[in-house]
Curated annotation (Swiss-Prot):
The gene is ausE. The keyword Iron applies. Its EC number is 1.14.11.-. This is Multifunctional dioxygenase ausE. One of its GO terms (molecular function) is dioxygenase activity.
Length: 301
């Protein structure tokens, strides 16, 4: 059942250990990490994506769909050197991803699904409540015991306030016994879900399981453009929304670290099965990096 008391989000500084943050993630399905991106990186990143964001027109439909008064931009790796050289090199991000997705001795168990700037305009309506794992519809059938398929580091680029529509999350909803579509009237929680706003300053983020019920709030302001950077990460066995290895130029990919190349699909993920090495997203049984002319990895990512 939905929580009886008003929910609250646990908060930790980015200096906290990955184990502390992961414990809160397991308990609530979501947790705020304060100072996840350093202030100077946030400022430079925002400046670097500004030209692209200014070219995007806003569709106003008044029907509450995903395009209503919201700008979206997914070519962060192309537009922003700060993004590809600094933000995605966060050791804390990878330490948490390893705890959520990876198995010992099997390399990176995850890669990027999308990396998107989301800018919610004044007057934007509230988003319907949903779970991100509904992107892969069959996952809900596994309920709370199912493995994580998708998670998100949702980072504030501008302040998140209740007035400008900060995301509303339902802590603990990753443990509800039934994962039905929560907007259907046969859902036990239909119309009863209590949520908490993710109030954040630029550089803060909330880490959220794909099982957690959430939705953007109503931007009731007349001036606030609420900008975020969503780092959506999925299990390596799943196909991502963005075809990064086809859209990001090789010139930029060559400048990335080995683990970032893997995150964007320029290197294969490695898994050991019955003594054999299997390459996900490989080429003729080998790491796709060989086909692309990248240097051999120093370790099996």
């Amino acid at each position: 059942m939905a929580p009886m008391n008003p929910p609250r989000l646990q908060r930790f500084p980015a200096t906290a250990s990955a184990d502390q943050i992961f414990a809160a993630f397991k308990e609530d399905g979501c947790v705020v990490i304060e100072g996840f991106i350093p202030p100077d990186q946030v400022a430079r990143f925002s400046q670097e994506v500004n030209p692209a964001m200014e070219k995007i027109t806003v569709e106003v439909t008044n029907d509450g769909n995903s395009n209503d008064r919201t700008k979206r931009f997914s070519k962060c790796a192309i537009a922003s050197p700060t993004f590809r050289n600094e933000i995605i090199e966060s050791d804390l991000m990878h330490e948490l991803c390893d705890r959520i997705f990876s198995n010992p001795g099997e390399g990176m168990g995850y890669h990027f699904n999308d990396t998107m700037v989301i800018e919610v305009q004044p007057g934007a309506p509230a988003q319907r409540l949903h779970r991100d794992q509904e992107l892969y519809p069959w996952w809900n059938s596994m309920g709370p015991a199912g493995p994580e398929c998708i998670m998100n580091f949702f980072c504030a680029v501008t302040p998140f306030t209740e007035e400008n529509g900060a995301t509303r999350l339902a802590p603990g909803s990753h443990l509800w016994p039934e994962f039905t579509q929560i907007n259907e009237r046969d859902c036990p929680q239909f119309g009863k879900i209590e949520t908490a706003p993710a109030i954040m300053q630029p550089g803060d983020c909330y880490l959220m399981s794909g099982k957690v019920v959430h939705g953007a709030g109503h931007n009731t302001t007349t001036t606030d453009q609420r900008r975020a950077l969503a780092l959506s990460i999925i299990r390596r066995e799943l196909r991502p929304v963005q075809a990064f290895s086809l859209s990001v130029p090789m010139k930029l990919a060559r400048e990335m670290s080995e683990r970032s190349q893997t995150m964007f699909g320029f290197r294969s993920a490695v898994q050991h099965c019955d003594g054999d090495m299997v390459h996900f997203w490989g080429n003729d049984g080998k790491d796709i990096a060989h086909h692309l002319g990248l240097e051999a990895p120093s370790v099996h990512i």
